[in-house]
Amino acid sequence: MSAINSTQSKQKPTIVRWMIFLLMLLLGAINYIDRTSLGIAMPFIQEEFGIEDASTVGMLHSAFFWSYALMQIPSGMLADRFKTRTIITCATVVWGGFQAIGAACHTVTLLALTRIGLGVSEAPIMPAGAKLMGTWLTPTERGRGSMLLDGGAPLGTALGAILLTWLIGHFGSWRIAFVIAGVGTIVVGLIAWFYIRNTPKEHSGVNEAELELIETGIQQAGGTITKKNRMRDIIPYLSQVNVLALIGGWCCYSTVFYGLMVWVPAYLQQAHNFNVKEMGGAMFVMFMLCFIGQQIGGVIADKWRSSGAPSNKVFHTLLAISAIVAGVGIFLCANSSSPTMAVVLLTIALFPLRWASVYWSIPGLLGAQHMAGTITGTMNFASNMTAAIVPIIVGFMIQWTGSYYAAMMFFATAAIGYLICSMLINFNRPMALKED
């Protein structure tokens, strides 16, 4: 027996857990390719559908976020109650279907309905991913896990800008681009079913060394708790400063990121006279560097915490840099008339912005793993309700003022809120767990 244990102790752990999170990164990227497809195709849709005012464009963008937001808490509960593998696969296949169906729409109403369907079906992915993180990654790996889980946003936005502008240019049709994006989504959803497993023990590719590494790390942090949660279970947590700051910070961050994601294509075209090709290239550069910055932030967070640094010092420093750089970059961009400087400043603003992704790991880090799906679902519900309202507000701002200046100031102000809320989170104080 001792010989066997000795052999196992020398065995190199497999990296199945990281392969799963790379697949989640791919799913997240496709998620955002499908989301951003509307913004990329909007000039063509506006011309074809006869849409002239920015407020209608804002309302069409918000259709996705309303349904996505309303499904966040139910999706978090699904992640806590059912198998994550099944939820991820079903959600991906269904949202791919809605993306493809969008190509058949000939009215604003029908297109809005497909965006609503897209929002409903995409909603379970992030809560399910947060649940996977709690069962597959040790606490010192969750910073990188969070960045991979949430890294699909900038990566998908960057790739979507290039891919969709190329498809539209090549085929001369935004409709064909939508169909190709939808079918590709369905294919990746099926791949996820064949590779992802709910726990490390279920995966045949996990060797004993990797299993021991995961289980030991999780047990040292207090273990995982299996508990089926109800909607009302979140209510006692809403009196805690950490939870309120978590929700508020994520809402402010979402205002900045999703505001830029939705409106930067139109901003570059209308305020700086970019053509579609130039806009696609600029979007690719900005959001690809945002993705790279996000991954760097994850590595810094994990290595810094592994060195024994206090959690408050690590996360407060990273989140402060993220918020301040984003806010200053957006403010300077709004006051610049140079197209080149606009792209440079927005790129600087976006580079550390996604360090906010550590928010996904906070419930687990603060000792609320059994409520991770429900808390992150609530957090995402609030932020996406914000994201649903923001396109409408910005659309009316642009329509009333005739420029993007007020909108950019709005995003810079939201960055200040993101900073304040992040500083209020006490990472050294666990959440007070509520018992039935």
Segments and roles (model prediction):
Residues L70-T109:
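Conserved MFS/SLC helix-loop-helix module at the cytosolic interface between two early adjacent transmembrane helices
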Residues T114-P154:
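Cytoplasmic helix-loop-helix junction between adjacent transmembrane helices
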Residues L149-H203:
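Helix-loop-helix hairpin linking two adjacent transmembrane segments in secondary transporters
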Residues I51, K83, F98, A104-L110, ...:
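Helix-breaking motifs and short loop linkers at transmembrane-helix boundaries and internal kinks
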Residues G143-I162, I168-G169, T185, C290-Q294, ...:
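Glycine-rich segments within core transmembrane alpha-helices of 12-TM secondary carriers
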Residues G39-L70:
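Extracellular/periplasmic helix-loop-helix junction of adjacent transmembrane segments
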Residues L38-G39, I235-G297, L353-A356, W360:
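Extracytoplasmic gate region of multi-pass secondary transporters
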Residues N312-Y359:
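C-terminal transmembrane helical hairpin of 12-TM major facilitator-type secondary transporters
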